[in-house]
Amino acid sequence: MSDFVQQQSVECRFESSDSWVILSPIEQSIKRKIESVGTPLKDWDIQINYGIKTGFNDAFIINTEKRNEILDNCCSDEERTKTAELIRPILRGRDIKRYGYNWADLWLIATFPSRHYDIEMYPAVKAHLLSFGKERLEQTGKKYIINGEEIKARKKTSNKWFETQDSISYWDDFFKPKLFYADITQKLNFCRCDEVMFCNNTTYFITAKNPNILTHLERCLNTKLIDWYYRTLSVQLGENAVRMFSIYVLNIPIPNISDMPLATLYGLSESESRYIDNLP
């Protein structure tokens, strides 16, 4: 047993307060090069925001058929226009792919508390929400017995019954160029989106003061090399899945903007590049 341990052992140096990870010599070399060359994502003048938590998706996230029904129930052109502006397309984590997304024709009734909407100005939306029962939509945390069935309201907040659970103060960011990525993923998938698109709480998105850098970030973050590196930082779920915690994502080292291959930018040797290329 002792001979086996000596033959299979790997020397690792744990010199920082970061999480410990056991790597082979070639993996240690690759990790050091990435960290010595790249600038942590947090220093690229970017912002990471979390997707929207409604507290009751059945009421607030609707398909195109229901959206059209709500719009058809509007009593005036003015109400229809205002309502169409309130209902926005939304992505889920499962919709995010590498360099793109598959929109599932879902829409969000975006009654963010920070927007201070008057629900009386949206009668068709109000009627739709009330069809689920006001007690169910209240944000009181209370329990009710209705027709012999226990109904639990959404968790207690200071928000109104028709509003989403989270306040969401970054409404304008959904209208900017952004990078979407899922909260839990089998492999790192980032996609740039320049259209108006919202996302739910299984998704994060990145905005940048200079939107031009988003394409560079998308290119880097979608590589096998960065996928491998991220797994040395984050906690793995099951065999392959990882959680995209911002504390780790913000520390991914990104090289300067260039058209050169990423392995070249990080200064990887030929054998190190082959090692990454041969990963499953």
Spans of model-derived segments:
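Extended amphipathic alpha-helical segments enriched in small hydrophobics
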Residues: 248-277
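Conserved beta strand-loop-helix elements of the APE1-like EEP
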Residues: 1
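Polybasic, glycine- and aromatic-enriched phosphate-binding surface used to engage nucleic acids
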Residues: 5-6, 11-254
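Acidic, turn-prone loop/beta-hairpin segments
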Residues: 280
